[in-house]
A protein has these predicted regions:
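Alpha/beta-hydrolase fold catalytic core
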Residues: 1-26, 48-51, 90, 239-240, ...
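Conserved HGGG/HGGXW glycine-rich cap/lid loop of the alpha/beta-hydrolase fold
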Residues: 14-66
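Active-site loop/oxyanion-hole signature of alpha/beta-hydrolase fold enzymes
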Residues: 43, 54-96
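Gly/Ala-rich beta-loop-alpha elbow adjacent to hydrolase catalytic centers
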Residues: 97, 101, 105
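Flexible "cap/lid" loop of the alpha/beta hydrolase fold
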Residues: 106-110, 117-148
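Conserved alpha/beta-hydrolase catalytic His-Asp/Glu region
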Residues: 148-200
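Conserved serine/cysteine hydrolase catalytic core
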Residues: 180-244
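Catalytic histidine-centered segment of alpha/beta-hydrolase-like enzymes
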Residues: 251, 255-264
Length: 276
């Protein structure tokens, strides 16, 4: 595995690249306030001889550059994804988008359909239920919180049903936490993800479905966001997507929105799909 910063016109993007230099490029696109550790479990399931795996911190997250007000939104992130593929010399590539990353993946597919070989949409496609805003906004507010220590934060979250299995989430949080006055807080600050959320509220993601002309795997979390905050993909939207996107297949996983990307079952299904 190689860690590096790739310099794009928009700024520096922190990346980790693993697998074979001659393998098919697969790019993992994280969620709203997430970082490159989001794809540890999924990438472990992918054959390192067949795939070149790129995980990255989106602009304004983790160790990537903050690009300032008015520079976020799905098209900006999609442009970065395409630029990353360009820098790695990949004429075609696969995409795995989790949560916000799924909508960004669809924008990439809309922008350069001839370059996108396969797409995995991980628990996002249409409009989430309104109740989802409660835990999502709480997570954004937490980004400004200072905790007494790294151990104190880990003790608060390690037993929450959002963050299971714990080991990959511990790595994600360990990557994200930094020392500040009086304790620890997060590398990722609220402005970038908040601007992306405000952008989402203005969009109709259903209009992006027509851009999916390549094989697509839609992975739906069958469990509500704990304790009862609903679904990012409703049952109705899941069925509608499979009707309206002829190139798509779907799978439902016994997980919630936060655990699905760390699920062994989801990872295996994704690996089988991308090996085709």
């Amino acid at each position: 595995m190689v860690s590096k910063h790739l310099k794009l016109q928009s700024g520096d993007i922190a990346c980790e690249i693993s697998g074979s230099d001659t393998g098919r490029l697969v790019i993992g696109i994280p969620g709203l306030s997430a970082n490159l550790r989001s794809f540890d479990v999924i990438f472990d399931a992918l054959d390192g001889q067949r795939h070149r795996k790129l995980a990255f911190d989106p602009r304004g997250r983790g160790r990537s550059s903050e690009t300032g007000p008015g520079t976020y939104g799905w098209p900006s992130h999609a442009s970065d994804v395409i630029a990353l593929a360009d820098q790695l010399g990949a004429p075609t590539f696969d995409l795995i988008g989790w949560s916000m990353g799924a909508w960004i993946a669809m924008v990439v597919a809309q922008s350069v359909p001839q370059r996108v070989r396969r797409v995995v949409l991980l628990d996002a496609a249409g409009l989430p239920e309104e109740s989802i805003k409660v835990p999502v906004y709480a997570g954004l507010d937490r980004l400004a919180t200072v905790f007494p220590s790294r151990d104190a934060f880990m003790a608060l979250v390690r037993n929450l049903s959002h963050y299971q299995p714990w080991a990959p989430w511990e790595r994600l949080f360990d990557y994200e936490l930094i020392e500040v006055d009086s304790g620890v807080s997060f590398r990722t600050q609220r402005p970038a993800p908040w601007e992306d959320e405000q952008y989402r509220l203005t969009q109709d993601p259903y209009k992006l479905w027509a851009a999916l002309t390549m094989p697509v795997l839609l992975v739906r979390a069958a469990q509500q966001v704990p304790p009862n905050f609903g679904f990012l993909i409703t049952k109705d939207d899941y069925a509608r997507f499979l009707r309206e996107v002829p190139v798509a297949r779907g799978i439902e996983i016994e997980a919630n929105h936060y655990t699905i990307g760390m699920s062994v079952d989801a990872s295996r299904a994704i690996a089988v799909f991308l090996d085709e």
